[in-house]
């Protein structure tokens, strides 16, 4: 009887280890993808800023600090401490919402260069990967909204009348918000991935 129990325990441990390994692999792919998007966003934003006059940069930065990104309507951890306390499923769901919120506005960032044309397809790949991770972690005992029910406010602030520098401001804000959101997703996925290694130090 004891040998049967031992064999079953070994089998269960093997299945559990395999699930963790699969999740780690999916997390590694997702983190690599969002890191690429974040670096891409940094480069595009830097290139755009370099094309502006000093006064234009100052004015646009001042306006942006007073404005909001679409992601500000998505409830997410307010600081690194809350991020570390959040569950894996919660971090994945928020990341999914952030990525999904860029499906439409990312079209405004496409075109004009090979770098910009990478954005939409890479966002789609990242969204698919995060959805797979959410499904793999759905057995977690937490009542968190399904990804299909996540609601996002319209990207209205980018399509309002912005005055004479409308095009400049819209591009500046889109690139700045895209960079900000990809950094958020990178942070959340990195912390969630770290949780799979109990001995790891997940301090931000």
Curated annotation (Swiss-Prot):
An example molecular function term from Gene Ontology annotations: growth hormone receptor binding
Subcellular location: Secreted
Positions with a binding annotation for Zn(2+): 36, 186
Signal peptide: 1-17
Pyrrolidone carboxylic acid modifications at: 18
Gene Ontology cellular component annotations, sorted alphabetically: extracellular space
BP terms from Gene Ontology: animal organ development; growth hormone receptor signaling pathway; positive regulation of growth; positive regulation of receptor signaling pathway via JAK-STAT; response to nutrient levels
Domain of life: Eukaryota
Disulfide bonds: 69-177, 194-202
Gene3D superfamilies assigned to the protein according to its UniProt record, in alphabetical order: 1.20.1250.10
Sorted UniProt keywords: Disulfide bond, Hormone, Metal-binding, Pyrrolidone carboxylic acid, Secreted, Signal, Zinc
Keyword Signal on entry: yes
Job of this protein: Growth hormone plays an important role in growth control and involved in the regulation of several anabolic processes.
Family to which this protein belongs: Belongs to the somatotropin/prolactin family.
PANTHER family per UniProt: SOMATOTROPIN (PTHR11417:SF2), SOMATOTROPIN,PROLACTIN (PTHR11417)
Name of the protein described by the UniProt record: Somatotropin
Organism classification: Eukaryota, Metazoa, Chordata, Craniata, Vertebrata
């Amino acid at each position: 009887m004891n040998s049967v129990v031992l064999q079953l325990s070994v089998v269960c441990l093997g299945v559990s280890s395999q699930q963790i390994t699969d999740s780690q692999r999916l997390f590694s792919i997702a983190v690599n993808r969002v890191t690429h998007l974040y670096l891409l966003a940094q480069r595009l934003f830097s290139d755009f800023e370099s094309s502006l006059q000093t006064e234009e940069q100052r004015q646009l930065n001042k306006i942006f600090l007073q404005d909001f990104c679409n992601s500000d309507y998505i409830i997410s951890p307010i600081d690194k401490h809350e991020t570390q306390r959040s569950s894996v499923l919660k971090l994945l769901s928020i990341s999914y919402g952030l990525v999904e919120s860029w499906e439409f506005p990312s079209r405004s960032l496409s075109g004009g260069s090979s770098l910009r044309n990478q954005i939409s397809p890479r966002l789609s790949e990242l969204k698919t990967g995060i959805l797979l991770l959410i499904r793999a972690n759905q057995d977690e005992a937490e009542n968190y909204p399904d990804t299909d029910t996540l609601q996002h406010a319209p990207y209205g602030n980018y399509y309002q009348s912005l005055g004479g520098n409308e095009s400049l401001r819209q591009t500046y804000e889109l690139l700045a918000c895209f960079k900000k959101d990809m950094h958020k997703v990178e942070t959340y996925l990195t912390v969630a991935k770290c949780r799979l290694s109990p001995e790891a130090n997940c301090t931000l």
